[in-house]
Amino acid sequence: MLLTFHGAARQVTGSMFLLETATGYKILIDCGADFNDKQNRKPLLHFPFEPSQLDLVLLTHAHIDHSGNIPQLIRAGYEGQVLCSSPTADLSALLLKDNQLLRAAKNDKEFAMAMVNRALDRFVAVKASHDFKVNEEVTIHFVPTGHLLGACNVLITLKEDGEEKTILFSGDVGRKNYPLLMDPVKSPVSPDYLICESTYGARLHQEKTAPEDILEKVINETCIVHRGRLIIPAFSIGRTQTLIYTLRRMQLQGRIPNIKIFTDSPMSMNGSYVYEKHLPWLDEEAKQMYKNGGTLFDFDNMVYIKTYKETKAISHYYEPCIIISSSGMIAGGRVNEHVRENLNNPFCTILMIGYSAEGTVGNELMQGKPYITMKKRDIKVEAKIMYTDMFSGHTDQQGLMEFVGQFDKQKLKKIFLVHGEPESMEAFKDKLSQEGYHDIVMPEKGEEFEL
């Protein structure tokens, strides 16, 4: 079989891998948008392969850096199905529509929606943790990974010349004991080949404190002591639900002061409905909370913002408050409005809770730049910028080592590191080598391997 790396090669975003069997059956694993530079944030117009010749697309999870170019793929001639877990199908309907509207020109909005709806018609939900026989040659198995609702590793078993070969695509590897979501599930078999993400391959999560303790400290300092506002940039799907759930849990424990919490992300409301629809994918505490209260994401002091007029009105709310708004990297969305209005406010704290790609405002803030350019205006940063990785859906180096550690070293013929910056990959590769793993590759974009 032939494996080609068309994305997430020596970078974090743009996951797209093409697997071709000995008989010529072609499977694309993920078809993500590339956010590494401003040019590549545009929809992909030309693929490095012929979409009409693909036989199958497998989607690890709904995040746009894994799914964002599926509508373009179908527009370019792909006629097959997109297989994924049931929650991934539901979340993709929200994320793809939102992404296409953001990327489309004003006069192309209607066409963009038609293109997304056409793509969504191809989605087929496959039961996770069960073998799914595609044909006599190919069997797939979705393994829940705890990164996002519905996120999975994809295990592919191929029968070639009377022999079985197994190849596992990690997707994004989640964390144990992450709020709201079930823990990652172990693969039913040890693969011959592993394609493994390495987002945090060079580091350990800094915080060992519980998420509630971190939030309590920041909220107390910002909203009680300084009577200011706390802005938390968060992706509408995933991080926002985790934050709201954590804040609700804190409210039930009496740990949140009586202040307004604005969730300014209309899509997050729909995302929350999807989470409550798929309760089996949540952890036991979340299931019990839903059973007791009938909701996970609605509580006293929570205000959901729907219109842009309401977004603007928040700037005239002068009491202490918490604002949760997307996007998490401050790379578009309503959070830009809140950040722009409050960068020079010394009583404001902006709490970054995850990775921000180069070229985004979030990345510049985390680098400590004294001035940020937004809407062609240089703004002095007087707000307090804080960072925690306790809400990151990605596991760290230790978690990645535990993930790889579940597999038989002797059976693993090759490990491909993807979805990480080069320095992260190098550090992870060195760690794997120290533990006795061999034949570890950091593929270049477009590089192909005969397996």
Model segments located where?
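Pre-active-site segment of Zn-dependent metallo-hydrolases
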Residues: 9-14, 20-80, 84-90, 95-122, ...
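Core dinuclear metal-dependent hydrolase active-site scaffold
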Residues: 1-52, 125-182, 309-316, 322, ...
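Hydrophobic, well-ordered secondary-structure elements that form the walls
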Residues: 335, 415, 440
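Cap/insert and terminal regions of metallo-dependent hydrolase folds
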Residues: 176-264, 349-354, 372-435
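Hard-cation-handling environments
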Residues: 218-358
